[in-house]
Amino acid sequence: MSQVNFIVVIPARFDSKRLHGKALLNINGKSLIEHVYSAALKSDAKETLIATDNNQIQEVTENFGAKTIMTKRTHASGTDRINEVAELECWEEDQIIVNLQGDSPLMPAANINQVAKLLSDSPDTGIATLATKILDPKELEDPNVVKVEFNESGLAISFNRKVKSKSNQMYWRHLGIYAYRVGTLKSFSQHERSEEEVAARLEQLRAFDLNMEIVIQEASLVPGPEVDTEADLNVVIAIMANN
């Protein structure tokens, strides 16, 4: 099986609304962003970069050896930030980029490789991403857990923070990881954000505005939690202390 040619970019902001300065929060002796970077290095990516608009983050990430690209402060989303990186690095239009969220320190390398291959195997699809089954009913009520619906072909139908009406159907949690080609990034970033995207704080809704298909697979491994809140941080600290 031929290996997919892909690059990982980790967008990292300091001014997170839900957990201020979380990229630099200490988790068992290392910053959150260093743990995410280490997770990415375990994948088959040919290169891993960090994209930030913060000098403090840049200093920390360069000190642990990460190639770090300084970007504008005005970007509306991590995808928009990564598009600037693609322009600065002059990547080819068909280069596959994996956007690994800067709050995902427990993302398995297998999932990073999986989402890149999913896009590579879907030449007519704009974006690829992953999901896991929601087994804890509390997650249905948690707005930090993004719910995704997709059809039998694996194409996304909707993304929501709230479940509008509960039923016995299987609910899926959207994971903070995307793969797209540089050409898709450009189209995405040139399009204005809709009121719905802004209100929901879900950048992937812009793809629907552009009629881009988003293909989804169940993640090969269930990752640990993303760090959105103080409670998440404490859970991740405990998990990493035991590993």
What is the meaning of each model-derived region?
Residues Q3-T52:
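N-terminal glycine-rich phosphate-binding loop and ensuing alpha1 helix
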Residues F14, K72-G78, L221-P223:
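Short, acidic/turn-prone active-site loops that include or flank metal/cofactor-
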Residues D44, F64-G65, L210:
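Short, structured coil segments at secondary-structure junctions
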Residues A45, E92-D94, S122-T125, M212:
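Short, high-confidence coil segments that cap the C-terminus of an alpha-helix
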Residues L49, N55-K117:
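Short phosphate-binding loop-to-helix
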Residues M107-E196:
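Conserved core of the sugar-phosphate nucleotidyltransferase
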Residues Y171-N243:
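Conserved alpha/beta core of the MobA/IspD/sugar-nucleotide pyrophosphorylase nucleotidyltransferase superfamily
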